[in-house]
């Protein structure tokens, strides 16, 4: 009897790695934009931090998006997330350009970045599961490590992108934003189109195959994941970590300036 051959998912895996890179890039770019926005839009420190408020406020939609994913599937959520990211960046390009010279330009910028953030939330729901299923199970840990490494590389590249493409020795003005954001929007839509036309496995496939065993073992587990104390401790730890990850790069430049 011949062994079942694992399909070659190299190309889809590369695309998903690009998505992981994009998640880290956009998230760090958002933090790196705060000092630029404060000067370009003439903001106070409090107003500048609205960039983070609007972006990370989108994560409250993670549970509704997870429910949506269970209905439309992983691939549709992945494509939709990239499409929303692309629309958000392009809307930022069009909206900021249209609102230049008005008091509403910063509000338009924030609203469009919140759209981008909604897309990023969708991508974070599905990226890691796809990394795990796009290849042999025994190399899943390696793929996951590589995807997180790319995410970390993106956090280094994003500030360089901001300084060389958006700032680049030019005056810090709102009109410097639309061009680069249009490029990012088009790039996200191109990746979405590629993923739409390629075949991807369902990360829930193994779960469905093992449903019988899961039912048999159900009595070993509590009725809800929230009944496990370490889930709450884990959530608290992540919240504290995010406060450090976001707070330090967002606040430190202002601290350096005043000191």
List where the protein language model places each region.
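Cytosolic juxtamembrane N-terminal segment immediately preceding the first transmembrane helix
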Residues: 1-23, 39, 100-101, 105, ...
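Hydrophobic core of transmembrane alpha-helices in multi-pass small-molecule transporters
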Residues: 102-123
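Juxtamembrane intracellular "pre-TM" segments in multi-pass secondary transporters
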Residues: 1-10, 205-234
């Amino acid at each position: 009897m011949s062994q079942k051959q694992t399909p070659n998912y190299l190309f889809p895996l590369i695309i998903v790695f690009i998505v992981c890179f994009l998640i880290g890039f956009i998230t760090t770019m958002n933090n790196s934009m705060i000092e630029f926005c404060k000067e370009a839009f003439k903001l106070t420190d409090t107003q500048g931090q609205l960039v983070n408020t609007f972006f990370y406020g989108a994560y409250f939609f993670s549970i509704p998006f997870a429910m949506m994913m269970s209905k439309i599937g992983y691939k549709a959520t992945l494509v939709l997330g990239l499409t929303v990211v692309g629309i958000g960046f392009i809307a930022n390009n069009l909206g900021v350009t249209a609102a230049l010279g008005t008091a509403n330009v910063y509000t338009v910028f924030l609203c469009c970045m919140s759209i981008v953030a909604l897309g990023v939330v969708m991508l974070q729901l599905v990226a890691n599961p796809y990394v795990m299923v796009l290849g042999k199970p025994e190399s899943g840990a390696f793929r996951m490590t590589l995807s997180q490494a790319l995410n970390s590389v993106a956090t280094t590249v994003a500030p360089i992108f901001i300084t060389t493409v958006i700032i680049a020795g030019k005056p810090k003005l709102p009109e410097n934003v639309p061009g680069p954001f249009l490029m990012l929007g088009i790039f996200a839509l191109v990746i979405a189109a590629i993923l739409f036309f390629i075949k991807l496995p369902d990360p829930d496939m193994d779960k469905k195959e093992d449903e019988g065993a899961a039912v048999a073992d159900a009595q070993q587990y509590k009725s809800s994941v929230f009944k496990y104390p370490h889930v709450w401790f884990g959530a608290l730890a992540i919240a504290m970590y995010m406060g450090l990850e976001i707070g330090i790069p967002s606040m430190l430049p202002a601290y350096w300036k005043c000191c």
